[in-house]
From Swiss-Prot:
Cofactor: pyridoxal 5'-phosphate
Record has Methyltransferase as a keyword: no
Oligomeric and partner information: Homodimer. The glycine cleavage system is composed of four proteins: P, T, L and H.
Transit peptide: first to last position: 1-63
Keywords of the record: Mitochondrion, Oxidoreductase, Pyridoxal phosphate, Transit peptide
Enzyme class, broadest EC rank: oxidoreductase
Main location: mitochondrion
GO biological process terms on file: glycine decarboxylation via glycine cleavage system
Source organism superkingdom: Eukaryota
Identification of the protein by name: Glycine dehydrogenase (decarboxylating), mitochondrial
E.C. designation(s): 1.4.4.2
Species per Swiss-Prot/TrEMBL record: Flaveria anomala
UniProt modified residues of type N6-(pyridoxal phosphate)lysine: 770
Subcellular location: Mitochondrion
Amino acid sequence: MERARRLAMLGRLVSQTKHNPSISSPALCSPSRYVSSLSPYVCGGTNVRSDRNLNGFGSQVRTISVEALKPSDTFPRRHNSATPEEQTKMAEFVGFSNLDSLIDATVPKSIRLDSMKYSKFDEGLTESQMIAHMQDLASKNKIFKSFIGMGYYNTSVPTVILRNIMENPGWYTQYTPYQAEIAQGRLESLLNFQTMITDLTGLPMSNASLLDEGTAAAEAMAMCNNIQKGKKKTFIIASNCHPQTIDICKTRADGFDLKVVTSDLKDFDYSSGDVCGVLVQYPGTEGELLDYSEFIKNAHANGVKVVMASDLLALTILKPPGELGADIVVGSAQRFGVPMGYGGPHAAFLATSQEYKRMMPGRIIGVSVDSSGKPALRMAMQTREQHIRRDKATSNICTAQALLANMAAMYGVYHGPEGLKTIAKRVHGLAGTFAAGLKKLGTVQVQDLPFFDTVKVTCADSKAIAEEACKHKMNLRIVDKNTITVAFDETTTIEDVDTLFKVFALGKPVPFTAASIAPEVQDAIPSGLVRETPYLTHPIFNMYHTEHELLRYISKLQSKDLSLCHSMIPLGSCTMKLNATTEMMPVTWPAFADIHPFAPTEQAQGYQEMFKNLGDLLCTITGFDSFSLQPNAGAAGEYAGLMVIRAYHMARGDHHRNVCIIPVSAHGTNPASAAMCGMKIITVGTDSKGNINIEELRKAAEANKENLSALMVTYPSTHGVYEEGIDEICKIIHDNGGQVYMDGANMNAQVGLTSPGWIGADVCHLNLHKTFCIPHGGGGPGMGPIGVKKHLAPYLPSHPVVPTGGIPAPEESQPLGTIAAAPWGSALILPISYTYIAMMGSQGITNASKIAILNANYMAKRLENHYPILFRGVNGTVAHEFIVDLRPLKTTAGIEPEDVAKRLIDYGFHGPTMSWPVPGTLMIEPTESESKAELDRFCDALISIRQEIAEIEKGNVDFNNNVIKGAPHPPQLLMADKWTKPYSREYAAYPAPWLRAAKFWPTTCRVDNVYGDRNLICTLQPPQEYEEKAEATA
């Protein structure tokens, strides 16, 4: 009634306004998008009509338009930050009459799309409609109790971790911790992860996560090859390894001409002298628990390195692989409090000895000191990574699964060593009780080998037993027609064991219960494999076992890290855009989170429908014919795309085509990925405008015409411009027998305006964690699905357990192999991109690209009088990112990009991408979801810093001792008793007026990178060592 009364009053007011303009109200008829949801009723003059006088009050009766009845919770206006009025004003500031004229001048006409239209969700779903749609999909998934195992297990995710990390934008919107001074929280958590891994594996070095267990095993295989300097070309894999791991290793080995042999342990043969390494599983994929001590001694005696894939929960009670003699240990931390999620994302790990530290893939966190000498954390040994060493890098892996590693680390912190041991013993006890019960039943045969959590059963008809289990909503693993395995986990109950007895009884009565026979069950672990070495002894793993304490610890770490909750993160080529809450919500729904990746597909029809819809939408957006959702990172997508091209050439008999042309401006992952595929890399330069030198490219293509495999190109270029000759570049490659691989890192400037397929690319990976809104998670997760033209679709990756391929499926299939451990990669985070695309609609997502370009050009225009803008397109505009040239400042003021980035921290900002793709520069990418006010604030900060630099150039402040060289300035430095700086504390802390209202504070002074690598420490140190260092510098 109240709403009706208000509407009537507003109607009369509008009617009076129409007949008496002198009382018009701008507030009511403002075109702003911020007008309330009532605005359609009160601003639509065309809907007002005169009618008869009612009750003598002169009331006007009005019709209501259909538009007024549409839902008001549309999404594009929440994601695309600039209002229409701001768009016009910003375009005018840049020198154009409106947004569209700017876009016309920026995107080459030769590649411009007239329009893009979705076949589904074209107008975009509202947020409430999207939630309802996702709930409908979720209802089509069936949650069965999983006993499949094979590296994936149900787990009880502590709700304090679920709510305060996985669902917390303060954790999931952070970027990779390149700016260590504003990342000490997640760096500490990742150091906890590394410490947990080293303690449990018994090896001294661990990285901060890898993509999945299978990928980690493939990386370990590559390490073995590198350790042997490529002189031994055979790698043996034990048949007791997970099938997906075996297939991933086989696929990876093709790229560097390594022969993979799968064999039973008893048949291993080193007599050829050509074996670089072996891979074994501990415990085995079918549950068997073997003592590898003598096996490893024999391998070492033959000069062979041993990789062991292991299970973290098992290692809490089993002798660690390091003590058995393993050289490298890999595995997954999924069962440490991370949902199965139909395959991921999960944090894998790789641990090894100090001897091989520089051959390790992935990020590694190390302990260093800051400029005051106090302990501080940072990413260590970055010089071995792909963004520096390119094709000579240890791996193409960038950051991997930091968010999930943090969850697993907090799980370890929350439970502590005793809690983990209790969980492991309970799981082992349930498995033992089940095995004992089956022996009592006598209907099947139980394996005699010892086991940890997985029981192998021989039976007359495995399919019949599995079908009976399905009736009880349980999934078992069918190994073959006479073999089943049953894997137990943290969520299994004693009642589940009783149900399993009924399943295996095959109709016979069960004269006992699990509870009744449990006291008779003996530990199945041999005494020689029982763990005796303590682990997780550091206080951090023994302090936070109540929810209140862990909550405060999580909050304390979060407070040290800058995220999108605080300010824009304008990293070029990283696309740090809004990760909307509606997009994130389905990720933690049990109907998506609690499905095993190898569950029957009929139990995951909601997922399957989403995959189909998403594949169709991505094909529309990119101009491709089919997509694979399997690659679970951008780097994995690059590798997969190149392997598709390789498979295509092989199928045509062109085995010799192995030359890959790569511009010098390419992402470092490009040459690293090409090297992994066994390609010979030829680089081509750029011209003075930042474009690929087409004539140099033409000569390289023609000179290698017989052997040309591919070109890798990023569009728009990494220099932040739309190259006018991109269609000609594609034609040159095709005319010389090659395929065009497009790096999708800059797709945020293409969507709706052009497309890789339209331009002429044959294959492209998409960084869903950039363009399509999956959060960066402080260094992962990501997703890198690949789209291909029709002729490449048959070669898209498949999977040995659940066959997959292209979406839509091609007519024929000749899959290249397996890229990731799970059939659809990190399926759990695909709803994020799916909801973004569906809610934006074709027009909203096209406008996102336009506004991203507008924001970049606006910032470039604001900054151009203070810093040179290095590259522009033919009409003087930039794409969605641009490069600021700081090189002259090194000579005039001694200032380098790192100095500017550190001073930006004092202004409350994360620095842009430093010294890439051009050394001595900053690359800035604002994205479409940052407001004009935020853009202005960042520009003001950079302009203010330029004024500070000018003071150095004028000689007014010291060349080496100034506010920029001293940045950042944490509170402990500002509050110290002694202040010896030649500038005031106040100016160091508050260089801009907005900071007085709210400021993000760094927690350390500038971190010493060189010290950290020269004194490499990659695990938690005893507290007394930190205290001694702190006292020494006090």
